[in-house]
Swiss-Prot record:
Coiled coil: none annotated. The lineage of its organism: Archaea, Methanobacteriati, Methanobacteriota, Stenosarchaea group, Methanomicrobia. GO terms for cellular component: cytosol; small ribosomal subunit. This is Small ribosomal subunit protein uS13. One of its GO terms (molecular function) is rRNA binding. Part of the 30S ribosomal subunit. Forms a loose heterodimer with protein S19. Forms two bridges to the 50S subunit in the 70S ribosome. InterPro entries: Rbsml_uS13_C, Ribosomal_uS13, Ribosomal_uS13-like_H2TH, Ribosomal_uS13_archaeal, Ribosomal_uS13_CS. Residues 122-149 are annotated as: Disordered. Residues 132-143 have a biased composition (Low complexity). One of its GO terms (biological process) is translation.
Amino acid sequence: MDEEEIKYFVRVRNTDLDGTKAVHIALTGIKGIGPHTSRTITALAAVDPHAILGKLDDESVGRIANAVDTYTEQVPDWMVNRQKDVYTGEVRHLLGTDLTMMNDDDVNRMRKMRSYRGIRHETGQKVRGQRTKSTGRTGTTVGVKRKKD
């Protein structure tokens, strides 16, 4: 294919992907798909991960889109990002705005039940047990001032 025939934007799962990048790198532009997941999707779609996304034909892009949509059914449960939904108990792989909304719902649920993690989220402190004595300070600078002679 010539340089003029490249598609600079390829739309997959309501996201514009960069057509000038390799398939496995371009797929990471979708929120919820990282490097490992993108490699798995290219293997499921039977597409070369190092091929340029904009140079693929429509049939290959369709296979990639289908692999993204059916990712949950084709991989083991430990490879998805929502292994046991709190409300429904089902195994799902969330992408895009669904992932953002579900994350916000989880944080709001923790705040509402007043769990330790919810309170830490509310107050803007570190949640996962990191040290807070010397790092993560915001606001005024804390330090020792030298006495001027």
